[in-house]
Amino acid sequence: MTMAYTNSNLVVYTKLSPNHSGARTHSIDRITPHCVVGQCTAEGLGDWFAKSSTQASSNYGIDKDGRVGLYVEEKNRSWCSSSNANDQRAVTIDTYL
């Protein structure tokens, strides 16, 4: 079965990161939340993930005002949880403290 990937229609800001592994090797069957410490904006996280030196990313981020940013399209594996096996099958979402 081939999975059709879509990106959330809740996204209000997009800045695609170079930090990903390309096409997934597993269909999406989980969500992985990840915490970003600090009061970031969707744009600020996009700027951080846009740096190749960061070597991190997520599919989405939800900022301090509840705005959703897209950083790695769902069809691609982000570099979020430090687990290839997890990130291949998860939509990863950074949230803010």
Predicted feature locations:
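Active-site-adjacent loop/helix surface patches within enzyme catalytic domains
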Residues: 2-97
